[in-house]
């Protein structure tokens, strides 16, 4: 397996990651034996990055990935999970992010994840599912920093992209 540096984090990730989303369905609808066997084969092939989120099977993907990794105990597994803040929680973003991460860690059976991603789109003005640049810089990033300083994750990411110009505006 080939590995590449993940930005400036110091992490070396396999060029092929293991997606635990509902598209293939294994980590949401598969049997425990199939999940364990498939993850074990991925690890044997050199895969070290596992991507999950609460949105994948309403937390079931995180629960199943946590169980499998606890059983297999891979030495170099890198786990990333995500938060998608629902519009109904935009009035209390910090609490929503904190609760989501705490719940994800509990489902995964981990004290810390390697990468915690924001999964909302970002636009200049926000609206719908999208956060505004002001919400991200004023509320999301400070909350992420506080949670990182508390040791709940190592690195942050943004996966919901949105408006490229808005992402470059700050």
Kindly give the residue locations of the regions a language model identified.
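Context-gated lysine
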Residues: 12, 70-73, 82, 106, ...
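Active-site beta-loop-alpha junctions enriched in small/polar residues
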Residues: 21-23, 53-55, 82-86, 118-121, ...
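Active-site oxyanion-binding pockets that recognize sulfate/phosphate
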Residues: 51, 87, 130
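Structural motif corresponding to the early beta-alpha repeats
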Residues: 71-95, 119-122
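Glycine/proline-rich, positively charged
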Residues: 27, 90-170
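N-terminal binding-site loop/beta-alpha segment at the start of enzyme catalytic domains
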Residues: 1-77, 143, 149
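Short, small-residue-rich loop/turn micro-motifs
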Residues: 10, 15-20, 83, 112, ...
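Structural recognition of the beta-strand scaffold that forms the well-ordered cores
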Residues: 17, 51, 78-81, 114-117, ...
